[in-house]
Amino acid sequence: MKVTSYSRILIILAALVGALVVPLKAQDSQQDYVNAHNQARSQIGVGPMQWDEGLAAYARNYANQLKGDCRLVHSRGPYGENLAKSGGDLSGVAAVNLWVNEKANYNYDTNTCNGVCGHYTQVVWRNSVRLGCAKVRCNNGGTIISCNYDPPGNYANQKPY
């Protein structure tokens, strides 16, 4: 069978697209979300979280409701919740890292924040042991990441760990 120049170009393009798709999905798996959370938790001696498909379905359903305008509005549901967005693509691991970076704003001794730190405290909340997350592409090309936690955290006057 003779391969034409056009066929070679199509084969090369298919290989390139395949090579690009794999990295885009590389930090959005269930295990990627769990690992990113558990890495932050292990740094302070808090036990690991486990993936919960029911929480993931809740996160996916709610994130799909936000994709019209990509605005971050909390669901006010029964779970703890962290939301992140980007004007372009955002990986799940990058979203978790945004939340974990709020650790710099948290003072454990006084249990206070100097700026925003509630996303971080939810990630490391000792009693939150189940996790479910979703990534949704917004109509404007942006991305929303939603993670839900059970039991929820961030109770007033309680330390996360």
Swiss-Prot record:
Induction comment: Accumulates in root tissue in response to ethylene (ET, ACC) and methyl jasmonate (MeJA). Stimulated by the salicylic acid analog 2,6-dichloro-isonicotinic acid (INA). Expressed after wounding. Repressed in response to salicylic acid treatment. Strongly induced in response to the incompatible bacterial pathogen Pseudomonas syringae pv. tomato DC3000 (avrRpt2) but only weakly by the compatible strain P.syringae DC3000. First down-regulated early during diamond back moth (Plutella xylostella) larvae (DBM) feeding before being up-regulated after 24 hours.
Tissue expression profile of the protein: Expressed in flowers, stems and roots but not in leaves.
Sequence ranges assigned to domain SCP in this UniProt record: 34-149
N-terminal signal peptide: 1-26
Paired cysteines (S-S): C70-C138, C113-C117, C133-C147
Keywords: Disulfide bond, Plant defense, Signal
CDD domains linked to this entry: CAP_PR-1 (cd05381)
InterPro entries per the UniProt record, alphabetical: Allrgn_V5/Tpx1_CS (IPR018244), CAP_dom (IPR014044), CAP_sf (IPR035940), CRISP-related (IPR001283)
Role of this protein: Probably involved in the defense reaction of plants against pathogens.
PANTHER family for this protein: CYSTEINE-RICH SECRETORY PROTEIN-RELATED (PTHR10334)
Name under which the protein is recorded: Pathogenesis-related protein 1
Organism the protein comes from: Arabidopsis thaliana (Mouse-ear cress)
Organism lineage string: Eukaryota, Viridiplantae, Streptophyta, Embryophyta, Tracheophyta
Gene name of the record: PRB1
